Amino acid sequence: MAKPTTLYDKIWNDHLVDEQPDGTCLLYIDRHLVHEVTSPQAFEGLRVAGRKVHAPEKTLAVVDHNVPTTDRSKPNPDPESAEQIAALATNARDFGVQYFNEFDKRQGIVHVIGPEQGFTLPGTTIVCGDSHTSTHGAFGALAHGIGTSEVEHVLATQTLIQKKAKNMRAVVDGKLPDGVTAKDIILAIIGEIGTAGGTGYVLEYAGEAIRALTMEGRMTICNMSIEGGARAGLVAPDEKAYEFLKGRPLTPKGANWEQAVRYWDTLRSDDNAHFDHEIRLDAANLPPIVTWGTSPEDVVSVAGFVPDPAKIEDEAKRLSKERALAYMGLNAGTKITDIKLDRVFIGSCTNGRIEDLRAAAKVINGHTVNGHVNAMVVPGSGLVKEQAEAEGLDKIFIKAGFEWREPGCSMCLAMNPDKLAPEERCASTSNRNFEGRQGFKGRTHLVSPAMAAAAAIAGHFVDIRDWKAA
């Protein structure tokens, strides 16, 4: 009888080309996504060596990190960013890779456009020179970020050298309360295991609450696997995944689709498969979450208080949290709902999809952004923007006082014109709250789209559960 295997084991075994005695493996890569920041050196390496891209049809290129989200008819204000964008256009043309430029309505954040185009498929291996490649694991794909030298290796060989990770599972059972979302689930998991808790593992998400999520919700969860230290995140594919993908430009068609679904139906962990580590959460007990510090593990209920580092026994950890409090300009014991905000950012590869914009618009409709808050909505792709405008969401945001922007990574990271000023405080639907992540000395609090929307109106954090009841 065959040994029970996990979903990760199955995908790994299906793509294993070679394994050396020391555990070093050569893995076949099905899909490769590239953007303007981590690809220029890789393409130049190919050019210098006189190599071609091995399988150009398996690579998709898009600009996202550096593109301005305002008027794109004007020159990029940052010369280095403009150079990187121009380099990607040249490299895509020279090496025969499909490319979505900043004027293409299919352009957007790389981890939004992959599933949107049907480039992301269950059971595939997917890499990108970007840490949030784990997003694609929502479809049952083994997806993770790689370095620039590895980008060159994949372009040249369609393979990757690596060692197999261990198996970890997060089981989230129960039903989410009103106002609690996928973003709160993943922040709760990271709060439970810490930012190093998943190190050395591929993390599969399972349980009633995960199965109940939409594909957008599953993408939010898998997106932040890296914030929990995991190499990748996975959710077993099901009818929701198939429905999302069917008919998209790059998915199989006709008999090929039916054949693919038959294979995808085998992609789930066996009942008695071994996991090296497992955690369990009850969704019914989860609150809306806000991060208070400079690490995604610094989580607290919106109904709670800024914690006191003095109560931490471990000296190194205590000093780290004291530094975080000082950087964030907060005092221990402060009510989370008393924290006032300067900026609100709704977007990113974590929460920039149509479902996220609908959730935010539902809260905002009929209200006005607080006078001391600057708020912006940045759709995750041109197609998300187009759909939102077809539904009239842009009008809701604009009427309320939000800026309605062009697609891109935007204020998730300080690599384009959308940045926080020093000591500005932002409620953000993105994935990282590190020091300087959104701008020099900027202060970031991670929240769900609905929480961000309510905070924009109130000017401070509010418990979305009370908001809905109001």
From Swiss-Prot:
Protein family: Belongs to the aconitase/IPM isomerase family. LeuC type 1 subfamily.
Catalysed reactions, as listed in the record: (2R,3S)-3-isopropylmalate = (2S)-2-isopropylmalate
Full protein name: 3-isopropylmalate dehydratase large subunit
EC number: 4.2.1.33
Pfam families reported for this sequence: Aconitase
Cofactor(s) recorded in Swiss-Prot or TrEMBL: [4Fe-4S] cluster
Pathway membership: Amino-acid biosynthesis; L-leucine biosynthesis; L-leucine from 3-methyl-2-oxobutanoate: step 2/4
CDD domains on file: IPMI (cd01583)
Protein's job: Catalyzes the isomerization between 2-isopropylmalate and 3-isopropylmalate, via the formation of 2-isopropylmaleate.
GO molecular function: 3-isopropylmalate dehydratase activity; 4 iron, 4 sulfur cluster binding; metal ion binding
Listed InterPro entries: 3-IsopropMal_deHydase_lsu, Acnase/IPM_dHydase_lsu_aba_1/3, Acoase/IPM_deHydtase_lsu_aba, Aconitase_4Fe-4S_BS, Aconitase_4Fe-4S_dom, IPM_dehydratase_rel_enz, IPMI_cat
Superkingdom assignment: Bacteria
Organism: Afipia carboxidovorans (strain ATCC 49405 / DSM 1227 / KCTC 32145 / OM5) (Oligotropha carboxidovorans)
Quaternary data: Heterodimer of LeuC and LeuD.
GO terms for biological process, alphabetical: L-leucine biosynthetic process
